[in-house]
A protein has these predicted regions:
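Polytopic transmembrane helical bundles with strong interfacial aromatic enrichment
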Residues: 1-520
């Protein structure tokens, strides 16, 4: 069933991944740098020191360049849902569209309104009003992130909705359940705090570059003082929310957790692999999954279920089942899901033929207010999405990509905590400028921060595969039935456009950094 649209699905996935990766190159800096600029402007308003005005305008200029390119790259993403993922849009558009609409109407207008005051309001409005505009721009950008992350979190953990048999759509039943789900709340805080860390590293890295060249040393030291403290605090918060993410994933997406750890066979007191080299063939042939590994005993069980002796299901348990621990095999879920898919097909046929007896019979099965309906929904429709798979092995994501991406993200996060703490401490004691090795490390930490941020999204999105909506809709079913050639052409057009935008951003940013702060 899915093979008919395989090439279209692949091109659609590649296009969305490419545009999302490019867009996310700009978003985290916007989320964090806005608050750093607001802090610096607050210091200017409180002290009336022209130094802080000059410093604020410099970082604000870099913020504006990044913001503009970020908006341009983000517009295309929402249109892709209608063009490449029309089945998805029909099936859950009522739910998924709501937070995106709120983001566009409320949050984006907030930031786009006040950013005009922020950039063009100097000497035209009072200092207090301008400062308020700067803070509201930063809050508006993060409010936009909230609603977008709510939509993404619903794809990971679909709640607050009910299936409407007549329209064959999932419809929202509780907005608060969607907007305030534990996945959405934790994902928001983990994403924005990690973005704050990236922005802090950007400011520290650029300032370190100035110190290496013995330029703008006062601005560099004071910028580092603010950014390193800001980044260190939020790096710790990111670690905390990351730990919470692991516990949530263990509960709602166990296959993602098993793939992240390359855990093929579940076990009690499962260890966490700190470092390891995978045997790629292990996914096909079995046997030891690693050439080499360093484990932390029982840590995976402790982090996932807050018990050192808890059972963590592995990939094989989730695919083939584990009767001892009550893990249902994927083959049974597929069979149950096919019953639901077949009933929907029967319902469609019955409506076309006007078969009222069949319509009444099937509607009773989907009526959760009756014992028969509640049982059918629990025993069969709960596994609806599985009905589109032909084999249990199809539910396994790319283990190697997840395993290494997760370790890049976590390893970089731990490194950033140490780096920012050390930079703050040495800068406070006026010893940072003499540590040229550390300044170079700070400069090179900037691209590492972007790599870690992208790796985090790889873990989140690749780990959900093969689902567009966890347990409800596979990616292959979500795609539009359009020629693959159409998608491939737009893929390369967008690739060229986004590459040009990235090149323009880097060129302008590097030129502005090289020029440095400007005197009024």
């Amino acid at each position: 069933m899915l093979s008919d649209y395989l090439s279209t699905v692949d091109w659609s996935r590649a296009q969305f991944a490419m545009t999302a990766i490019y867009h996310w190159l700009f978003v985290p800096l916007t989320l964090g740098l806005g608050f750093l600029v607001a802090i610096m402007e607050t210091l200017y308003v409180r002290t009336k020191d022209p130094f802080w005005l000059r410093t604020t305008k410099f970082w604000m200029r870099l913020f504006g360049i990044n913001f503009a390119i970020g908006v341009a790259t983000g517009l295309i993403l929402e249109f892709e849902f209608g063009t490449n993922w029309s089945n998805y849009s029909h099936f859950v558009g009522d739910i998924f569209g709501a937070p995106l609409a709120i983001e566009g109407i409320l949050a984006f207008f907030l930031e786009s309104t006040f950013i005009a005051v922020m950039f063009f309001g100097w000497r035209k409005v009072s200092r207090g009003f301008h400062l308020t505009a700067t803070w509201l721009t930063a809050f508006g950008a993060n409010l936009s992130a909230w609603w977008i992350l709510v939509a993404n979190s619903w794809m990971q953990y679909p709640v607050g909705c009910d299936f409407n048999l007549e329209t064959v759509r999932n419809e929202m039943t509780s907005f608060s359940a969607v907007a305030l789900s534990p996945v959405a709340v934790n994902k928001f805080f983990h994403t924005v705090t990690s973005s704050f860390v990236l922005a802090a590293l950007f400011v520290v890295g650029v300032s370190a570059w100035y110190l290496l060249r013995r330029r703008e040393q006062l601005m560099a030291r004071r910028s580092i003082a603010i950014a390193s403290a800001f980044g260190f605090v939020f790096a710790l918060v990111t670690a905390f929310t990351g730990d919470r993410s692991g516990a949530i994933v263990a509960r709602v997406q166990p296959m993602k957790l098993a793939a992240m750890e390359a855990l093929y066979d579940g076990q009690q007191g499962a260890p966490l692999t700190a470092v390891g080299i995978l045997r790629p063939e292990a996914q096909r042939t079995g046997g030891d999954a690693f050439y080499f590994r360093i484990d932390i005993p029982k840590m995976l069980s402790l982090m996932s279920f807050r018990s050192a002796d808890a059972f963590v299901p592995g990939i094989n348990d989730l695919v083939y089942g584990n009767e001892e621990y009550g893990v249902m095999p994927a083959s049974e879920k597929i069979e149950r899901g096919r019953v639901a898919v077949e009933e929907l097909g029967r319902y469609r046929t019955a409506r076309e033929k006007g078969d009222t007896a069949a319509i009444t019979e099937i509607e009773a099965k989907f009526d959760r207010s009756t014992p028969q309906g509640a049982e059918f929904l629990r025993e069969h429709f709960a596994y609806f999405g599985y009905g589109y798979f032909s084999s249990p092995e199809q539910i396994v994501p790319d283990v190697s990509l997840l395993f290494y991406s997760f370790r890049v993200m976590v390893g970089a996060g731990c490194f950033f905590i140490l780096l920012l703490g050390l930079v703050w401490w040495l800068n406070r004691r006026d010893r940072l400028a003499s540590k040229r090795w550390l300044l170079r490390t700070a400069v090179w930490s900037v691209p590492l921060a972007y790599l870690a941020s992208q790796a985090g999204w790889v873990v989140a999105e690749v780990g959900r595969q093969p689902w567009a909506i966890q347990d409800l809709m596979p990616v292959g079913v979500a795609a539009s039935k359009i020629p693959s050639g159409s998608v491939s052409v737009t893929f390369f057009l967008f690739l060229a456009l986004f590459t040009a935008l990235l090149a323009a951003e880097l060129s302008i940013m590097f030129r502005q950094i090289k020029t440095g702060p400007k005197d009024d």
